[in-house]
């Protein structure tokens, strides 16, 4: 069967060249006589994979030396608790911007551990825009401020990095990791699940400024303690070896393409093709404020639940899968992450044009 174009919000497509290389190495990794899936995480050969992956991540994303890169487990959702447990160590206060479901979940989890304030929210318009804030909106005594940089469900993305002054800014970048350059130095923590742009599900990456490490609460579980994981080189327990290996291959792929500047150009071009058609369509529409539109997750509707369902069904039959919007909002969503080729977007638009013509 021919490969389909997978528009899933995650897990998502992986580059075909990466899949081919992984397939070629699956039985015998570099003459070791074993698969990465079965080798000991304490072996020299896997330690080399781990080191290469971390070094590549630092190089590709230009992560400064005063940041630790942690390869963890538990998904981004586990960090909803880990972040306050590691950072609420001064005033016990934190500021959150609520721009979608995941920042809201993170806020609710953090409320268990301290005095958490909502500094801005776009819930009033179904999270269809990013609120504008200034430094004066943030509490200078807060231990940290929190945002979700790209909102997978609603198709929005911060068009700016909030100025929080001396308060460390924490960002969930799960759905925009490695999609474009990011100035890590503007953040205290950048983290995300890998299953959208970086690797298969199972790996969570936390980039944390070193001065924020080692101040966790006494009740912090060992598996959530950043210092514990940093001191043990992310191998306090058995890490997700296969996902880390795949992360290494994806990083090599990005580097070969020309790095994150080139990736940004590719992603902007793909998004423009899709948004331009939606904006010109008489059937399809996008509810997001233009300046806040995501490059990764493009949401759209027909205006009719019946037509939406028909579109999703017929699209799947034509080889465009996982276009159904999140259950909380309905409609459609095309997630066009790094590995989605421009041909996939072009062919989707051709299908949308034909669907509009026939309906």
Segments from the language model and where they lie:
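Conserved active-site segment immediately N-terminal to the catalytic lysine
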Residues: 170, 184-195
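Conserved PLP-binding catalytic core of the aspartate aminotransferase-like
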Residues: 284-315
């Amino acid at each position: 069967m021919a490969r389909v174009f997978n528009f899933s919000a995650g897990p998502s497509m992986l580059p075909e060249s990466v899949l081919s290389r992984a397939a070629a190495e699956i039985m015998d990794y570099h003459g070791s006589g074993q698969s990465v899936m079965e080798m000991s995480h304490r072996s020299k050969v896997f330690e080399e994979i781990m080191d290469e992956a971390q070094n590549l991540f630092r190089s590709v994303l230009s992560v400064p030396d005063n940041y630790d890169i942690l390869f963890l487990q538990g998904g981004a959702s586990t960090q909803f608790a880990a972040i306050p447990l590691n950072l609420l160590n001064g005033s016990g206060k934190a500021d959150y911007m609520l721009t979608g479901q995941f920042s809201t979940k993170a806020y609710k989890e953090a409320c268990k551990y301290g005095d958490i304030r909502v500094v801005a929210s776009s819930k009033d318009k179904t999270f269809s825009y990013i609120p504008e804030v200034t430094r004066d909106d943030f509490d200078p005594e807060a231990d940290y401020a929190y945002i979700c940089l790209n909102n997978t469900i609603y198709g929005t993305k911060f068009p700016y990095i909030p100025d929080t002054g001396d308060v460390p800014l924490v960002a969930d970048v799960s759905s925009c990791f490695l999609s474009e350059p990011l100035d890590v130095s503007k953040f205290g923590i950048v983290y995300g699940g890998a299953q959208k742009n970086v690797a298969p599900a199972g790996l969570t990456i936390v980039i944390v400024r070193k001065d924020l490490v080692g101040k966790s609460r006494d009740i912090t579980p060992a598996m959530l303690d950043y210092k514990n994981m940093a001191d043990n080189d992310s191998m306090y327990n058995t890490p997700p070896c296969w996902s880390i290996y795949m992360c290494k291959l994806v990083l090599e792929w990005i580097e070969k393409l020309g790095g994150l500047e080139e990736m940004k150009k590719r992603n902007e071009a793909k998004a423009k093709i899709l948004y331009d058609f939606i904006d010109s369509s008489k059937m399809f529409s996008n509810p997001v404020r233009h300046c806040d539109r995501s490059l990764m997750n493009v949401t759209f509707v027909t205006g009719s639940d019946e037509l939406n369902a028909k579109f999703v069904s017929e699209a799947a039959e034509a080889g465009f899968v996982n276009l159904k919007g999140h259950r909380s909002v309905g409609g459609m969503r095309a997630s066009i992450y790094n590995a989605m080729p421009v041909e996939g977007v072009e062919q989707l638009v051709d299908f949308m044009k034909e669907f509009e013509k026939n309906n």
